Amino acid sequence: MVAARRAAVMVLVASACATGAQAAGRETTLDGATEERILALDPNNISASELRDVLAQAPAPRIVDLQGSVPLVTMAPFAEFMVAMGYPRESLTNPADGSLTYSSFVDARKLAGTLAWYYEREGMMPMLIGHSQGGMIAIRVLHELAGDFGDSIPVWDPLRDATEERSVIVDPRTGLQRPVLGLQVPYVAVLATGTLPRLLLGQWSMLSRLREIPDTAAEFTGFSLEWDPIAGNFGSADTYRAIGSARVRNVVLPRTASHITLPLAQELALDPVTRAWIERYSPGTAVPELSSDTNPNLANLLHAADIWYSVKKHWCLEAQELIRSRRTRAVPLQ
């Protein structure tokens, strides 16, 4: 079953001409009954059984997991956590090297163009999750898409690692051409991203923008540690704020959490007790406390559960929008 599901979400890559090609989409065929079951899901309340039996039948948006500047711990363990929770591995895989993590030493403009490339072909905007400097890159991508660093962004083919020499795509939801500029990322999460490293690394252009989240994010969650010398926090954490319509949340992590080891969450999905807690978690609602003698280390439980809640929510929303848009345009989901 797992192999069949993974095969169902493989990408059909279509070459695009200078003016943009018709989106090829994912090689996924859903019957009408399955589509109706997906459309009936409540994105804010997806149970483990609904994810396993219904949502897993749908294609999943790509997730770009951006690691920190010193990858003593990459984002691969966090990606493995999401795979263990039920997210398709292919949607987390870096096409450049087949790994489950992305370097944060990347041109954010190129990454913005890559998101557009995927959206045009798959009909679903990727999500961004960044740790430390990776979080800065995720926020920089949002500002790139908002036009803060230029008035156009070229489409970038991640498989060829080359530009397509165009700054417009064919929007798969409307069939019309549109610029890359202004595309909206459905969900962005950043972990322990601070201003001190921006100073030390000479990333001056992001100092004034690091805590400002533009409209190019639909939903953004910033996770911070109050005591985090690496990020430059000494007893308090600066908050992120929307400069438009983005829905922005700030989450302070427990003192037991560590800047470097925040991506280490896989064991939380493998332990029955912590997995059940994560599956019941919903931001702002009471969840029973776990005993401190629970087998896995609980330091990373809060952000793992919070991110997983948002990932499955936006997986559902993107899948539902894909179905609706293709029905409207009378294009089979294939």
Features from the language model and the residues they span:
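C-terminal catalytic-base region of ester-bond hydrolases, centering on the histidine
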Residues: 199-334
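Active-site catalytic motif of lipid deacylating hydrolases and related acyltransferases
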Residues: 25-126, 263, 287-288, 292-333
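Short, highly selective alpha-helical patches that border small-molecule cofactor pockets
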Residues: 75-79, 138, 234
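Serine-dependent carboxylesterase/thioesterase catalytic core
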Residues: 89, 107-220, 225-231
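Hydrophobic/aromatic beta-strand patches that form the interior of the parallel beta-sheet core
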Residues: 64, 93-95, 189, 219-223, ...
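N-terminal secretory targeting signals
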Residues: 22-26, 138
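Hydrophobic h-region of N-terminal signal peptides that target proteins for export
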Residues: 13-21
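Bacterial N-terminal signal peptides that target proteins for export
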Residues: 1-9
